[in-house]
Regions:
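Bacterial N-terminal signal peptides
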Residues: 1-11
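Noncatalytic, solvent-exposed loop/strand surfaces
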Residues: 14-466
Length: 466
């Protein structure tokens, strides 16, 4: 990862952790000397009680920013002192609505991003806000409501003075750029051929070219100009719902996508809308009502097919249904760059077995890592897609929402059940320690400096060696 990171802007250096999963979403840190053994009563430097939230903490030189929600339904942005964990301020965000959420999601799932001084946050039930280092509100920008039955999950990203936010939903999807100091819109591009998604974008700086931002979404990967929002290149071949954030090396981007009904062998060839209308559209209104459809599977899954929720299936609904039934899950290695449609030209390899649902992949020291629910951990050769080792993480056979991270020759993996596994990194990885907490963990760990930060449902811990 390091060669690519050196091509990007200064805030993306591996010594920083300013956004979701740190430097360009990689999950890789240059931290060293972190303890293998830690827990509520071992190697804890400090612990700060917090309201719940799935977002991970992000860091400036002296401060920590995160989002949360409380039992009264209030949304919070919280700032802590990095040295001792003391809460410096907390600010309530407006909550004009309470949108539908998946049971595994939360009202405070997207992580904050910081430019080293100010914080920027996104909430499903409001939109974007920015706070100064002392908690003064700099600007606010209402967005939504969003037609996403699972709630939003993608985190904001900074590229220089540009704040980027992807908002993919069943309808009305868009990608927008704002000036970080004013919240003023720079550009907005509509994404009508995209349904719900949760993946945070990553930045790409080609040699001699303009800075780009790569967005995984339904069915395709798209690279946009950071300056203008223009589509520069794109490629098809993704599944219908993207949750993990991709990782990159100098030449390739590794995109993971798993969605229900799209494992290998589950694909179906669905007839075009025009053909279906001829036989099913009894009232000849150019749309399909539920009572006109003889297929019980479609009727049963109505809420997932009627994307705009208007009670009938139109041409877009049906095309998205066709695309969804043809989509295939996979971890795909795409060659970076190009111009225009790169479908059929950019795929280096594809792996379709034992795929995680939510956790992002990790690329560290020449090895790709995946962690799947049930504690199935896999190492893969990024050059070929060959599995190097696959085994269960004994002692942590749990559900996983947090993504793996790496530092100092170690990989850290946190389960929902409160187990944090420390592995010796490598093709033939080894479990060194399974640490246990008496609380759930949804947030991705942060190895930074000489400390390891773990957010549980009720607290943020800083661990280190005495």
């Amino acid at each position: 990862m390091v060669p690519l990171l050196l091509l990007l802007a200064a805030p993306l250096l591996a010594a920083d952790w300013t956004q979701f999963r740190g430097p360009n979403g990689s999950g890789v840190s240059d931290a060293k000397g972190l303890p293998d053994e830690f827990g509520p009563s071992k190697n804890a430097i400090w612990k700060t009680a917090l309201p719940p939230g799935h977002s991970m903490p992000v860091f400036s030189e002296t401060r920590i920013f995160l989002t949360a929600y409380d039992a009264d339904g209030k949304l919070w942005t919280i700032c802590l002192n990095r040295e001792d964990g003391k809460v410096l301020w907390r600010r309530e965000a407006p909550r004009p609505r309470n949108q539908e959420l998946h049971k595994a999601n939360s009202p405070a799932s997207p992580s904050a991003v910081t430019d080293g001084r100010n914080a920027y946050v996104f909430f499903t039930d409001f939109g974007l806000l920015s706070y100064g280092p002392d908690g003064e509100e700099r600007w606010r920008l209402p967005l939504g409501p969003f037609n996403n039955p699972f709630g939003m999950g993608a985190s904001p990203v900074l590229a220089g003075d540009t704040l980027l936010q992807i908002c993919d939903s069943e309808s009305g999807s868009f990608f927008a750029a704002f000036h970080k100091d004013t919240g003023k819109l720079k550009w907005r591009v509509e994404r009508p051929d995209v349904a719900r998604g949760f993946s945070t974008p990553v930045l790409y700086q080609p040699n001699g070219g303009e800075l780009q931002v790569i967005v995984p979404g339904s069915y395709r990967l798209v690279s946009y100009s950071v300056a203008t929002g223009e589509r520069i290149w794109w490629t098809s071949g993704l599944t219908w719902q993207l949750k993990p954030t991709p990782v990159m090396d100098r030449d390739r981007i590794y995109v993971l996508g798993w969605a229900g009904g799209s494992d290998t062998g589950q694909q179906e060839d669905i007839a075009p809308f025009e053909d279906v209308l001829k036989t099913w559209d009894a009232n000849k209104d150019g749309a399909l009502a539920k009572e006109e459809i003889p297929d019980p599977k479609i009727v049963k899954d109505w809420s997932s097919v009627d994307l705009d929720r208007n009670g009938v299936l139109g041409a877009r609904d049906w095309q998205m249904f066709r695309d969804r039934r043809a989509a295939q899950n996979g971890l795909t290695a795409f060659r970076l760059g190009g111009k225009g449609d790169m479908t059929g030209k950019s795929v280096a390899w594809r792996y379709t077995k034992s795929l995680p649902n939510v956790p992002s992949p990790l690329l560290y020291d020449g090895v790709l890592y995946l962690v799947k629910e049930g504690g199935l951990f896999t190492s893969i050769d990024p050059a070929t897609g060959e599995v190097l080792k696959q085994a269960r993480l004994q002692g942590a056979l749990d559900q996983y929402f947090a993504s793996p991270v790496a530092a100092g020759g170690r990989v850290y993996v946190a389960s929902q059940g409160g187990h944090v596994v420390v592995l010796k990194a490598g093709a033939q990885w080894e479990v060194l320690q399974v640490n246990s907490f008496d609380d759930e963990i949804h947030s991705t760990p942060v190895p930074l400096g000489n400390r390891l930060y773990i957010r549980t449902r009720s607290a943020l811990y800083a661990f280190g060696t005495p």
